[in-house]
Every structure is written in C-alpha cells, then in structure tokens.
Amino acid sequence: MTAKDVAQSLSERIAPYADVRVVGIPRALMYHRLGTKWRTFFEALGREVVLSPASDRAVFERGQLLSVDECCLTSKLYLGHVAAVAPLCDAVFVPSFALPGTFRSYCTKFQALPDLVTNAFALVDEPVRVMSALIAEGADDKTEREGYVSLGIQLGATAKEARLAWKQAKKAQEERDAALAEAQRDLVRRIRKVPEGARPLTILVSSHPYVAHDPFVGGTVTDALRAAGAEVLFADEFDHAKALKKADEFSRSLPWIVNRELVGAILSLHEYVDGIVLMSAFPCGPDSMTNDAIARCVRGKPILTLTLDAQSGSAGVETRVESFVDILTYQKRGGYFHE
C-alpha cells in the first residue's frame, strides 16, 4: 500500500461522507420537530438538501412492506419516506438520538433508527447509504454541539466550520420554535377578545409533532376539526421550556421529554380551550402510558382519545371527531336544556 493509499484510507475513516453533496431527509418522525435545524446545518456546510414527498397511502404502504409488524405506524411510515428520498440523494440522514438525561429521553426507537433503516433495506436487497450521527437533542449546548461537530467532520468540514454550522442551525431552530409559540399566544389572545357567546370552539390537539402535523397520520383529524368550525391549538407548538417546567406539577418522573412538554402545554392551555384531543400512533408505548394518565388526572375539560393505525379509515375518524365537536357545542350552549 502506497503512502497515497494510506492517506486516502485514513481520510475515508475520518470523513466517510466527504463525497456526499446531496443529503436526503425523510419527511417523517423528528423532521417535524427538528427539520429546520437539520436543513440549516447541512446547507451551512454547502450541501444540498432534498426532502421526501408529503406522506400519503403509497408512501406508507411501501414502508409497511419494509417493516416488521411490531413497529409503530410512524416508524413504518418513516421507512416509506426513506425509500422515497433515497434515489434523490447521495446519502439519507438518519440520526441516532442519545439520552441526554433521566427525564429527557426519547422513545428507544430513535436510538436504533439507523440500524433499523440499514437492515430493513438490506433484507430486501435494496441497500441504502445511511449517514448517521449520535446527537443529544435536549442536552446542554456543549453536549449537543459535540454530536453535530462530529457529523460535520465526517462530512469533511473542519471543527470550526462544523461549530459555526451548528450555531446557525440552532439559531434557526430557536427562531422557528419561538415564532410558532408567539403565533399560538396571539391566537389565544384574539380568541379571548371575542365575546363569550360568539367565541369559536377551541380545541387543543396533543400529540407528537410527527403525528399531529403529518397529513397521512393526523391530517384527517385536524382537517375534520377545522371543517367543523373549531380553532385548533397544537400542544407541541407551546413554548418548550415553559411546558417542561409546568409538567413538574403533573409528574416529576415522566421520562420522555416530548411527552413532558405535551403535558406541560395541556396544563398551561387548559383554561383557554373547550376540549382536548389526545392523538397517538398505534402502538406507541410512551403515549399509551402518558395519555392514560392525562385522561385520568386532568379534570374539567372533555377529552377525546384517538389511537391511529393503518386500519383507521378516514370516515371512522371523522365521525368520532364530529361527534366530539357536537358534544362540545351543546355544552358550550348550556347543555341539552338550553333555550
């Protein structure tokens, strides 16, 4: 082996993704929470970013064929998005989520996601080039930055360039989150200014962002609520830091950071809404525990619990939502005995 070969081999180990010019990001799972950060990071390093198309039945069915039965609905959908974006890019970004703290963890599927994707496609002899990194979202800045700097170096950037890209990405994500939280506060203020008798029905939708904001998963529910004339608030758009602090009033031992944020948002927005919709994708473990506790312990507002799966027809979901809205409307008017 020549010196040139040794140097090339060493370079490939240090920067295995240096040849990647187009990065594919599946439009599923944590893209709905962190997509702004990821896109900004890669673009700051001079990469082009392409997204998979919006979710639909075809994308899901492709993912279902690649998945085992035990995977949750959104994991199956994710595999479909990987299949859709893989031909459009040099590598697909599939991060692995570290556990930044005892009460700031994520569902364990996020740790194993790169292995899940790699093996699912290998089993059908359709290998996909996966670009991964261990990132600690929700940890302190130093710990989180280390994961992104490591990824940047693997892309061939210097540590300084990677730190700058992370800084830009973090700022863009914070601005996006702050804008959503401010828009929600503004909507609540505008609703409160309307006289009680003319105030629209206001419903809080609580679910993971990859359920609430995915057109194939939660889109039917939010569309049905709006079609019925309701104003819809999303728990995941509430200020994350305030939600985490408020969640301590509900439980100090709830381990999953996103579920803690959702609980805190429910407690914070409780007095401003007429009803709450709890949505989860079958068979989500964290949601099954958290939503049951919410239904038992959060009092004073009607709650509709929806568990969505591949067999959930839109007609059935729409019927349940419409019935829930009808009940809330009657209640708002004073019950069945109003004049």
Language-model segment annotations:
Residues 1-339:
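An N-terminal assembly and electron-transfer interface module characteristic of large anaerobic redox
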